[in-house]
């Protein structure tokens, strides 16, 4: 009989339970052909054994097949004929006891080639070496590319917008006023088309920084020779940028007393992202800056007050039409967020905290923003956390409290009888320069104090009426405060009574 083995080849007969066993050889001497495995006493390449004859094929170190044959002793031959595989070595053995020199007829073959058989081969070593070298070179090139690109960006001005001469969407000679008028007459009323906004953003040249706040920086820039203001938001203030852009592009939002919106864009420069909001430029700056350096007469005071409340009234008013405008509350009114134009009128800016009222669903649309308003201008219901956040009118009345404080700032700078007070912030004499919630809560909610009036106001009719107006704006009870429309009408009557044309 033949006993064949290649890898884990079963040798012998099977028992009833399926287990393979080696047959018990006959107790006689068996002669076998031997090659490369001949003992010293062999004659004519013949050896003798009481076990098995075998023939084996295996692969040498160079990968060539080598055939050997010989005798296996009875002891341990069962295990040897099973030929337990050796890792990374190709080998096959066949055994027999049928007759003398029976292994002449055995022709074992190498087991099929497996990928792992080449792990230690010289060809694989060369391939591995080449692969590692190529990958290392590519990695070095990528690192060098990234490094030089980073250094190139570092050498550029921090806030420069690439001047890509893309005139496809903006014909030469078109001014910003032309573009805005065209969008109002033929568009949706929600601002310039997005593609035009992006083109303007690409073509702006940044000139100088003119301001800095908690949200980012303000730059004066130029587009085709026209001055514009570019508000550059910190990446942490993306929610404010998104909200302000959204509010400015609300249908029918444009108004002479709301800061004129031009464009918004996100500029990626590799190592950082810049959020741009481009608006009209007003060289007088904020009302806060203007009042610090400028004194007023009755006409200029009323002009500042009337134009400011006109912008606020437009914000607060819902417009019903096929393309209507929702009512909007500012939520961060202060003199630093109102700008002064060349003609002495004001416009309201910084709408990053604004809240909208959706009348169709009776829903208050509050921005997902961690930023809060300015503590000095917060009304009592915000300071003591009693404001009803689900009632839009609560936000409107909170704005009116803040506006009353702004009127006080303006009126103090109006000259009467040759006397004028220096500019001061509201509650300057009652709280520190950077008050805490507790500071403001104690003064506004607990002690119920408000900014004091100079004695001279009582002898000047215009200032006396202004004092009465602001008192009704900052009343402790929100329901008792005047609306923006009522303040606007009152200021118009005051101007008319003094023959002042606004």
From Swiss-Prot:
Post-translational modifications reported in the UniProt record: Autophosphorylated.
Disulfide bond positions: 32-53, 34-38, 47-71, 81-95, 96-102
Residue positions binding ATP: 210-218, 231
Cofactor: Mg(2+); Mn(2+)
Encoding gene, per UniProt annotation: BMPR1B
Organism for this UniProt entry: Homo sapiens (Human)
Family: Belongs to the protein kinase superfamily. TKL Ser/Thr protein kinase family. TGFB receptor subfamily.
Protein name: Bone morphogenetic protein receptor type-1B
Catalytic EC class: transferase
GO biological process: BMP signaling pathway; cartilage condensation; cell differentiation; cellular response to BMP stimulus; cellular response to growth factor stimulus; central nervous system neuron differentiation; chondrocyte development; dorsal/ventral pattern formation
Location (main, coarse): membrane
EC number, UniProt record: 2.7.11.30
């Amino acid at each position: 009989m033949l006993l064949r083995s290649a890898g884990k080849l079963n040798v012998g007969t099977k028992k009833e339970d399926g287990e393979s066993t080696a047959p018990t050889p006959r107790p006689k001497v068996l002669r076998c052909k031997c090659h490369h495995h001949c003992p010293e006493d062999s004659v004519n390449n013949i050896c003798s054994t009481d076990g098995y004859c075998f023939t084996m094929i295996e692969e040498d170190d160079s990968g060539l097949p080598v055939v050997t044959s010989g005798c296996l002793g009875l002891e341990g031959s069962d295990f040897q004929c099973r030929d337990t595989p050796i890792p990374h070595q190709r080998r096959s053995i066949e055994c027999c006891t049928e007759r003398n020199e029976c292994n002449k007829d055995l022709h074992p073959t190498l087991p099929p080639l497996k990928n792992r058989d080449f792990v230690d081969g010289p060809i694989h070593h060369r391939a591995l070496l080449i692969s590692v070298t190529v990958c290392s070179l590519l990695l070095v090139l990528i690192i060098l590319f990234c490094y030089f690109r980073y250094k190139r960006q570092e050498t550029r001005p921090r806030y420069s917008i690439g001047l890509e001469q893309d005139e496809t969407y903006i014909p030469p000679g078109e001014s910003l006023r032309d573009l805005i008028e065209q969008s109002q007459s033929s568009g949706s009323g929600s601002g310039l088309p997005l593609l035009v906004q992006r083109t303007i953003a690409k073509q702006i040249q940044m000139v100088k920084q003119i301001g800095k706040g908690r949200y980012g920086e303000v730059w004066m820039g130029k587009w085709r020779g026209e001055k514009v203001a570019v508000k550059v938001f910190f990446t942490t203030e993306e929610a404010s940028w998104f909200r302000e852009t959204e509010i400015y592009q609300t249908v029918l939002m444009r108004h002479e007393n709301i800061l004129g919106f031009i464009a918004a864009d996100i500029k990626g420069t590799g190592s950082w992202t810049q959020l741009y909001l481009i608006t009209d430029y007003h060289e007088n700056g904020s009302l806060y800056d203007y009042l610090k350096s400028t004194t007023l007469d009755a006409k200029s005071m009323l002009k500042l007050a009337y134009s400011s409340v006109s912008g606020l009234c437009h914000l607060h008013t819902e417009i019903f039409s096929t393309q209507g405008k929702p009512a909007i509350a500012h939520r961060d009114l202060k003199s630093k967020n109102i700008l002064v134009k060349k003609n002495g009128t004001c416009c309201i800016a910084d709408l990053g905290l604004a809240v909208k009222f959706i009348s169709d669903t009776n829903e208050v649309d509050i921005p997902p923003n961690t930023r809060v308003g300015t503590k000095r201008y917060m009304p009592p219901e915000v300071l003591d956390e009693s404001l009803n956040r689900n009632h839009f009118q609560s936000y409107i009345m909170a704005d009116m409290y803040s506006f009353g404080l702004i009127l006080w700032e303006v009126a103090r700078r109006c000259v009467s009888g040759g006397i004028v007070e220096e500019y001061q912030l509201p509650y300057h004499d009652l709280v520190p320069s950077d008050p805490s919630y507790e500071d403001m809560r104690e003064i506004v909610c607990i002690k119920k104090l408000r900014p004091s009036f100079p004695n001279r106001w009582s002898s000047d009719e215009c200032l006396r009426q202004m004092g009465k107006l602001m008192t009704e704006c900052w009343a402790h009870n929100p329901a008792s405060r005047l609306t923006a429309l009522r303040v606007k009408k009152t200021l118009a009557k005051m101007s008319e009574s003094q023959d002042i044309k606004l």
